[in-house]
């Protein structure tokens, strides 16, 4: 399972309920992916964002797809009920940066002003 927090943030219950039918249930926790929303950013702003990631760059859609393919493969047939972060490591350090990121990133400021 995947597609966002609204779909299934916790795959454990479906894993328990569907496991007896041979169905696995997992969640991909995708991080930032380069999209056209990044187009207005300057190269310096892009680099500043990338510097926050332990992997040094945002994840690609191909990397997200590779994780999905793996979880759908025979090699992962006994992996169920997991949340797999594919986020360039930002999830492990997000709390440290979250306050400053929201306060200083123009996109985030506009997003939170709408809420």
Regions found by a protein language model. Name each.
Residues 24-34, 72, 85-87:
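Conserved SDR Rossmann-fold cofactor-binding beta-strand/turn motif
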Residues 1-17, 70:
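Conserved catalytic helix of short-chain dehydrogenase/reductases
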Residues 16-20, 33, 59, 72:
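A short hydrophobic alpha-helix cap/turn motif
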Residues 19, 24, 79-81:
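Short, small/polar-rich loop/turn modules that mediate ligand/substrate recognition or access, typified
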Residues 20, 30-53, 94-115:
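A glycine/serine/threonine-rich, flexible loop-to-helix segment
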Residues 53-64, 75:
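A conserved structural motif in NAD(P)-dependent oxidoreductases
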Residues 77-93:
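Short-chain dehydrogenase/reductase
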């Amino acid at each position: 399972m995947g597609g966002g927090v609204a779909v299934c943030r916790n795959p454990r219950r479906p894993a328990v309920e569907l496991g007896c039918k041979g169905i696995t249930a997992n969640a991909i926790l995708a991080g930032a992916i380069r999209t056209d929303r990044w187009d207005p950013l300057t190269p310096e702003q892009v680099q500043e964002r990338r510097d926050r990631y332990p992997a040094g760059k945002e994840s690609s859609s191909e990397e997200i797809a590779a994780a999905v393919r793996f979880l759908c493969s025979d090699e992962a047939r006994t992996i169920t009920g997991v949340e797999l972060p594919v986020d360039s490591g930002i999830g492990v350090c997000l709390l440290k940066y979250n306050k400053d990121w929201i306060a200083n990133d123009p996109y985030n400021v506009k997003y939170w002003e709408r809420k």
